[in-house]
Each structure stands twice: as structure tokens, then as C-alpha cells.
Amino acid sequence: MAARMTIMLPLAVALICLLQTEPGMAAHSHIRKVLQLFRSIELDDSKKSFYLTAAKYGIQTQLREPLVRFAGGFAPSTRLSEACVKNAIARIYEIEGEFYAKFSYACENHDPYSVECLEEAQDDYPTKLGELFKKTKKCLRE
């Protein structure tokens, strides 16, 4: 009886560990894919540094991190739609362009390229990124 327990106990523990790591490994691969696609985003480095910081922070907090959390909950058998993420990234460039326009030449109440224009332009930017997250979330699974 003791010999049987000596063999069965390690096998049971190994099986439990294997079952626990399987979803985590899939989640890890989904997260890694989303992050890899987001690393392809390149904003124009010639723009003001405080603007770039605000733009990147918005993308990170309103879109990338929520998508990573969402993709992390996928089952191992779920396929991640790369096309969906790539479409979202293309839309990011459009939203960032609108944000930059409000910060620069379309700024009405302050000097263009000023911190005041940035603060004024930031009102709409996170909202649009949040809406993009909601749309992307719907098509993320193939």
C-alpha cells in the first residue's frame, strides 16, 4: 500500500501541475502576440517629447494593457485574430493624427504646440482609444 502511494502521489501532483500550466502557456502566447504587434507601432520621433509621452501613455493604458488582460483570459484552443489587432493599430495612427492636429495647428485657444493645447486635446484622445478597445475586443477571437 505504501509503495502504491509513493508512486501515485508524484503522478497526481505532476498531472495537477500539467493541467494548471496549460492555460497559462496559451495565455502567455496570446499576450506575447498582442505585445509583439503593438511593438510595431512607431510614432514620429520629431514631435515634441511631452506630446509623444502623452500619446504613448494613452495607447498603453487605454488599449494595449486592456487588450493584454483580455487576451490573457483566452482558452488554449482560442485563436487570436492578428488581422483584428493590425486593424486596431492602423486606427491608432488615425486617432493619434487627430490628437496631434488638435495639439498643433488646430489648437484654437492657446499657442500651438503648448502644454495647454496638449491638455485640451487630451480630452478626446483616451475616449477614442477606449472606443477602439471595445471594437477590437469584439473581433479579437477568430
From Swiss-Prot:
Subcellular localization, per the record?
A: Secreted
**Membrane spanning segments where?**
none
Question: Record's GO cellular component, any one?
Answer: extracellular region
Give start-end of the signal peptide. Answer: 1-26
- Stored InterPro entries: ALL3/gSG7_salivary-like_helix
| Pfam families with a match to the protein in the record | Aegyptin_C
Query: Disulfide bonds, which pairs?
Result: 84-139, 107-117
UniProt GO molecular function = toxin activity
Q: What is its main location?
A: secreted
Q: Which UniProt keywords apply?
A: Complement system impairing toxin, Disulfide bond, Secreted, Signal, Toxin
Protein's job: Salivary protein that moderately inhibits the alternative pathway for complement system activation in the host.
What's the protein called, per UniProt? gSG7 salivary protein
Tell me the organism's taxonomic lineage. Eukaryota, Metazoa, Ecdysozoa, Arthropoda, Hexapoda
